Swiss-Prot record:
It catalyses: heme b(in) + ATP + H2O = heme b(out) + ADP + phosphate + H(+). Gene3D superfamilies: P-loop containing nucleotide triphosphate hydrolases. This is Cytochrome c biogenesis ATP-binding export protein CcmA 2. GO terms for biological process: cytochrome complex assembly. Keywords: ATP-binding, Cell inner membrane, Cell membrane, Cytochrome c-type biogenesis, Membrane, Nucleotide-binding, Translocase, Transport. Residues 2-205 form the ABC transporter domain. The gene is ccmA2. GO terms for cellular component: plasma membrane.
């Protein structure tokens, strides 16, 4: 379980949120919503331990995140707004970098992400959407329980969004957790996703 307890965050003397508390249990996924500058990416960075709140605490499995950082990161898949891949490597080589023990599974993961036939193409030669798919192919490889995804559908077509949404649904059905930001609808998942709306100084579930 991931828990945010009474989080407070300020940027440039502006309060993004105050008194923000919520939990994400096994089998749940949460969509963080809000306008530009509402603090969506900032919240995800706090939840992953990449930044510290100005007040409050994040807990993982009942322990303060700052005390269990190593075990937490072994349970976390974080894909930020930037794909975080190496453009000089091929799609296959990028996945091998993150998942060196899964060589036999890499082609299938890339195919699931819509990159069949592009396995050995240098990432620098791929489109923005294809580069995004290289990063998202990790969803078919990771064993992490918690997925935190910042705008995962950027530059992804409708069919790709549907396929990725099905993968997230399968992960939560198996007891995993997903937290994501997106401006796009989640096809077939509208009734199962919990929404956390950042409203500028507060939030609502």
């Amino acid at each position: 379980m991931l828990e945010a307890r009474d989080l407070y965050c300020e940027r440039d003397e502006r309060t993004l949120f105050r008194g923000l508390s919520f939990t994400v249990e096994a089998g749940e996924w949460v969509q963080v919503t809000g306008g530009n500058g509402a603090g969506k990416t900032t919240l995800l960075r706090l939840l992953t331990g990449l930044a510290r709140p100005d007040g409050g605490e994040v807990y993982w499995q009942g322990e303060p995140l700052r005390r269990v950082r190593d075990s937490f990161h072994r349970s976390l898949l974080w894909i930020g707004h930037q794909p975080g891949i190496k453009t000089r490597l091929t799609a296959r080589e990028n996945l091998h970098f993150f998942h060196p023990g899964d060589g036999a599974r890499l082609p299938e993961a890339l195919a699931q992400a819509g990159l069949a036939g592009f396995e050995d193409v240098p990432v620098a030669q791929l489109s923005a959407g294809q580069q995004r798919r290289v990063a998202l192919a990790r969803l078919w490889l990771t064993r992490a329980a918690l997925w935190v995804l910042d705008e995962p559908f950027t530059a992804i077509d409708v069919n790709g969004v549907a396929r990725l949404t099905r993968r997230m649904a399968a992960h939560t059905a198996q007891g995993g957790m997903v937290i994501l930001t997106t401006h796009q609808p989640l096809p077939g998942a509208a009734d199962t996703v919990r929404r956390l709306a950042l409203t500028g100084g507060g939030a609502g579930l």
